[in-house]
Structure formats: C-alpha cells, structure tokens
Regions:
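N-terminal leader/linker segments that initiate helical-solenoid repeat arrays
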Residues: 18-68
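TPR/TPR-like (Sel1-like) alpha-helical repeat modules
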Residues: 31-38, 142-166, 172
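TPR-repeat structural position
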Residues: 40-43, 79, 113, 147
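Alpha-solenoid helical repeat scaffolds
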Residues: 48-51, 87, 121, 155
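Alpha-helical adaptor scaffolds
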Residues: 60-127, 132
Length: 172
C-alpha cells in the first residue's frame, strides 16, 4: 500500500511541476513575440494571453478562484476584503507574482503607496517582465510626485512591451 501512495505522489508532483514548466515556456514565447510585435492590436492580443497565464495559478486551481474573487472585490471597491484575500493567497504561495501584484494594486487604491511599492518590488523579483507591475510602479511614483522614477518605470515597461498604448502615451 505504501508503494501505491509513493507512486501516486510521484505522478502528482511530476504533473504539477510539468504544468509550471509549461506555463514558463509559454510565457517565454509570448514575451519574445511581444517584444518583436509592431502593432498595437497584436500587442493587445499577446498581453491578454500573458495576463491569462499570470492570473492562473500553475498548480492550485483554488488559488486562481481566490484571485478572481479578490479582483471582483477590488472592482466593487471593497479593498480591505480584497487585501485580506490576496494576503491569504500570498501566505499559501509566496512565489505567485500575480497575487503580489493584485495586492499591490489594492494597496495603491487604498492610498498606501509605500506598501504598494514594496509589493511591486516582490512582483518584479518573481517576474522581472511584469509590465503591469512596472506601469503600476510608475503610477505610484506619479502619485508620490517622484516623476523621474515614474518615467523610468514606464520606460522599463516599454522595453518589455514596446507597443503598449499606456506606455506609448506616457513616454515621448
């Protein structure tokens, strides 16, 4: 019986590991296409594919559901509940960049700019190509009237996603 559980554990672990690896492979391909893209329409399509991968936890479907619930609460301006949900997700998986990103967004909307920047820094340690976090970082710096830092964040985002309409408007 122990052998059965051991084999089952190996199969499950291998599947979860493969799923995370597949997500990274897909992201790498999409980021290459995004950098080479020369139309805003195609850029938006690629961005949406990247966001779908970021928003989907690679191994835990419940965390994906929780992230969506937290995002719904943000849309309804229930920031404290959303913050708590994102914090619980982070407690369960501190390596999921998108949970940190959503919490950073929530902190920004709550007016807690320094805390938002701390979370954004973690997002960027986990996923250095997170153009959304870089744009968010720029927005936080704009609110703090640190315009040079804001510009640099927007510029860095434009290197990753050159055709993003948000950064194209902000960078001359």
């Amino acid at each position: 019986m122990k052998k059965y559980y051991y084999v089952l554990f190996i199969i499950i672990f291998s599947t979860l590991s493969l799923n995370a690896e597949t997500t990274n492979t897909k992201l790498n391909k999409l980021f290459i296409q995004l950098k080479e893209c020369n139309s805003q329409k195609q850029s938006k399509i690629l961005e949406n594919k990247i966001w779908r991968l970021w928003e989907t936890h690679p191994t835990n479907f419940q965390l994906t559901i929780d992230l969506k619930e937290g995002s719904r609460l943000v849309q309804n301006r229930n920031y404290l509940k959303a913050y708590n949900i994102f914090s619980k997700i982070i407690d369960k998986d501190p390596n999921w960049a998108e949970a940190w990103n959503r919490r950073a967004t929530t902190l920004y909307l709550m007016g807690k700019h320094k805390n938002a920047l701390k979370d954004i820094d973690i997002v960027l340690k986990l996923e250095k190509r997170h153009f959304g976090a870089l744009i968010g970082k720029g927005q936080v710096y704009m609110e703090m009237k640190e315009y040079e830092k804001a510009y640099n964040s927007f510029l860095e985002s434009s290197y990753i996603n050159p055709m993003n309409s948000n950064t194209m408007e902000l960078i001359p």
